A protein has these predicted regions:
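Structural preference for beta-rich elements and adjacent junctions enriched in aromatics
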Residues: 1-186
């Protein structure tokens, strides 16, 4: 997975694994391989490359509780800052995230073939959380009492990422995409 976040002032505070990363600006990945709305996985990462990965047997709204001790075994992740981090004296372009999750890390909770076969579809969503901030002593301080902005790949109809039945589908294929005259997929 990869994501590019435009952000004129890249900042973060959390550095410890399995902190509640969505308390910082972050990027999030949600995976429900069999698409049943249960047994799904979540991964969050902030500009400081701190991560939070968790497994949910069922959604919070259905009485589910997250397993915070669970990890994507063998996951690789990296953050690239285009600018500086936690420096209010300049203007940044943003930050980029790359995440590689081994199929074996998801197999136990997939409920379907993992790796998937051509034609299989998984429920997936992506989220970008961004907070308003104030300048403080050459850095940044998140504004208290101001809700964060949330962007999602597949609209939820609510500010709640834990509605897996509203996530989009990713279909796997062993075929190369067809290209039109402009070189774009048709």
């Amino acid at each position: 997975f990869g994501a590019d976040m435009e952000e004129p002032h890249v900042w973060g505070t959390l550095t410890k694994r399995d902190s509640v990363i969505c308390q910082d600006n972050d990027f999030e990945i949600f995976l429900d391989p069999d698409g049943d709305g249960e047994r799904y996985m979540e991964f969050e990462i902030n500009p400081l490359n701190a991560v939070w990965d968790l497994y949910l047997p069922k959604a919070y709204s259905k009485g589910g509780e997250a397993d915070h001790a669970w990890d994507f075994e063998g996951i690789r992740h990296a953050v690239q800052i285009d600018g500086t981090v936690n420096c209010a004296d300049d203007v940044d372009r943003g930050w980029t995230v790359e995440v590689a999750i081994p199929w074996t890390a998801m197999a136990e909770h997939a409920g379907c073939d993992c790796p998937p076969k051509s034609g299989d579809a998984w429920r997936v969503n992506f989220s970008r959380v961004e907070y308003e901030y104030d300048y403080h002593k050459g850095g940044y301080l998140r504004r208290d009492g101001v809700p964060c902005d949330n962007w999602v790949w597949s609209p939820q109809g609510a500010i709640n990422m834990h509605i897996p039945e509203m996530w989009g589908y990713v279909e796997f294929s062993d075929q190369l995409p067809a290209h039109g005259e402009a070189g774009r997929p048709q």
